[in-house]
């Protein structure tokens, strides 16, 4: 079984040492879906949510979150991000929204967590902004 790199031989958590790794361009992509009622999705698409343009705010929140990943994932390295993009595409047939992110940096460690964080927070933002339309 492979050894978990975030724990020492005694089982204590530690941040992985990447100081000897070569600096290279790193790119990661992530994606996810938010499912909702068709009426809710139509309200979002018609920009009838009083809080604002759901997709634009979700993109901004995803970008902001990707830059804060090391603050919320304890053993994630703080990195300098060169680029973050988010795309949000509605799928009316399946009553869902497809979210993708792409994150780029030049560094010694990857940006997978930043890409996943961007999608996760964008999805949470979409859900939060639609809460007033959701009947639980």
Question: Where do the model's predicted regions map?
Answer:
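Conserved catalytic cysteine-centered active-site region
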Residues: 123
